[in-house]
Amino acid sequence: MQRGLPKVLHAPPSLLTGVLILSWALGSAAYASGSAPAEPPVAVAQSLAQEPALDGNVLDDPVWRAVTPARGFWQVQPAEGAPASERTDVYIGYTDDALLIGVVCYDEDPAGIIVSDSRRDSNLEEGDSFQVLIDTFRDGQNGFIFGTNPAGLEYDGQVTREGAGSTGPGGGMGNMQSGSGGGFNLNWDTTWSVRSAIGDHGWSAEMRIPFRSLRFAADEKPVWGLNFQRNIRRKNEIAYWSPLPRQYNLYRVSQAGALQGLDLPSLRNFKVIPYALGLAQRGGTRDGTDLSQELGVDIKYSLTPSLTLDATYNTDFAQVEVDDLQVNLDRFNLFFPEKRPFFLENAGVFSVGTPREVELFFSRRIGIAADGTAQPIAGGARVSGRLGANTNVGLLRMSTEETGAAAENNFTVARVQQELP
């Protein structure tokens, strides 16, 4: 008896396409049901009668036991949308003077924790790390980032326009303003403290961020934007508290969660940094002793919680970090990032154009003559910050002294940026 060949059914291409789309949709729905929540998470800050001991030991401090931690981190890599492989608890409290953050990064293999560097503002992507994004104006564009690692590294910077044009947070290339008025300014350094500790549970850290170091609206009970990032280096894992798609990073301020529960006092930041230099020369052909002296002062004052005045007289930048060596092999100018503290406050307000290509204002040209020699700055002032909810302002006035062939110069820069709804 002869057996017949089985019949092969040929489905039309449109039917196959529909089946594939339906299968993808059902799979996506099933995946989403076990993935991150659709709504951004909310954390509540707890008012503290006293500050915890800043030693990095969060679990052993009774102050943190009264605080409900924020938890629930979600991966962007290696498994996008999956829960983080390790538990992370973040405790948030505040006093009249400072915002306090304690984090416990649990790890099933504490011996596998990787620490690559402990220098300030070093690359956090090369080891285990934890970062905090704070959007004090809740504008979804600008914010502050504070980070650390198991060695207690201090990492801080300002995000402008969601870091447009810059690399990811924690990296080594985010040390300059980039993008058209946006970027990440890693050279911005403020006053804050952090301590870390490694234990059998993993590692933990405590941050103390004075309110005077932040800029925020004068609301008594504000709601701030908030997000956290944890890196587990040996697993190549990056996880966020407020989940993000793979193509975004911590600079995506618009997708941050919320921080509630703050009851802030009205504070004014006033800082005066004077300096004095003296020089005595004697001997050689001199009949006596030649004496010379230099006096100067830097002042920072918060006109409002969101508007800052910086003033300087006989400016001295001797303590500023030295630029990295660059070799120029073509006819184009070299661009060095601005590291002078006077120019770093709200530097993004003055940034217009594409860095290293078309920039309307480049602050490093102030204090340098046409032939490349240093030209002393006699003094100056700048006002920068925010007026109202949608207006950013910046005004700068600087004067340089006459030296040799370089004449005295005055520089004035003003910018008003109105954000449309």
Positions of the model-derived regions?
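N-terminal secretory signal peptides that target proteins for export/translocation
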Residues: 1-12
